[in-house]
Regions:
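Structured loops at beta-to-helix junctions and adjacent beta-edge loops in soluble globular domains
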Residues: 1, 7-9, 71-73, 109-111, ...
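Cys/His-rich finger/ribbon microdomains and the adjacent scaffold used
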Residues: 1-35, 44, 51-56, 62-67, ...
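Secondary-structure transition/capping motifs at alpha-helix termini
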Residues: 12-26, 51-64, 76-77, 98-99, ...
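Helix-rich, typically C-terminal accessory recognition domains appended to large enzymatic cores
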Residues: 44, 94-215
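Active/binding-pocket-proximal capping segment
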Residues: 72-75, 182-183
């Protein structure tokens, strides 16, 4: 596991670990996402192997990962790590049945900053479910109307793109969801006043939302 990322870029090469051409084109890894528990074993040895392979000329970089992000853990009640042995594992099946998988996906991102642990409480998923219903109604109510974009709509559209982009780039995933909620509320208010929202703004909203609620 200390050098698997090298084989990913050249896994059919039976002559060498990785071709220099492919290594130069695709490595080092841009972003490594993993739990902090890997820091003292896998990540440490990955650095050793990478530096060694660089020293002997197999690759031309001496650090395996450009950026590292350690995500937090979703815990059970009282902050206890979920495990089958403790009997505190939460099955998603009931939540998916009652609220849909998109609500569950977005709620998991919304519970807190991704780098921190968060205690699981499924009561909060109802708020995300209501938000998605509100957004769906906004899209359905406006999709067949020929609404001309107002300055206010264009402003919200541009602000939405900016907020989602900058928060994604900083891995502030919980605030990405809150930005969707905030701007959707603004668009709902505009729709009541203008009779709907223009198609470009709706399309932008749907495209930005797709990675978080694809269904």
């Amino acid at each position: 596991s200390s050098w698997y990322f090298l084989r990913y870029v050249d896994n059919h090469n039976n002559e060498e670990l990785v071709s220099r051409e492919k290594a130069d084109a695709m490595l080092p890894v841009d972003m490594y996402i993993g739990g902090v528990e890997h820091a003292v074993l896998h990540l440490l040895y990955s650095r050793f192997y990478t530096k060694f392979l660089c020293d002997i000329g197999v690759i031309d970089f001496d650090e395996p990962f450009v950026k590292l992000f350690n995500q937090g853990m979703i815990t059970g009640k009282n902050g206890i790590k979920m495990s089958k042995s403790k009997g505190n594992v939460v099955s998603p099946d009931d939540l998916v049945r009652d609220y849909g998988c998109d609500s569950l996906r977005m709620y998991e991102l919304f519970v807190g900053p991704p780098e921190l642990d968060a205690e699981w409480d499924d009561r909060g998923i109802d708020g995300v479910y209501r938000f998605l219903k509100k957004l769906w109604n906004l899209l359905m109510d406006s999709k067949d109307k020929d609404i001309k974009p107002t300055k206010e709509m264009i402003k919200v559209r541009h602000k939405l793109v900016y907020d989602i982009t900058t928060r994604l780039e900083s891995f502030s995933l919980n605030t990405v969801i809150s930005a969707f909620m905030e701007h959707t509320n603004t668009l709902v208010a505009i729709a009541k006043k203008e009779g709907g929202v223009d198609r470009d703004t709706l399309d932008t909203l749907a495209v930005l939302l797709a990675p978080f609620a694809p269904h």
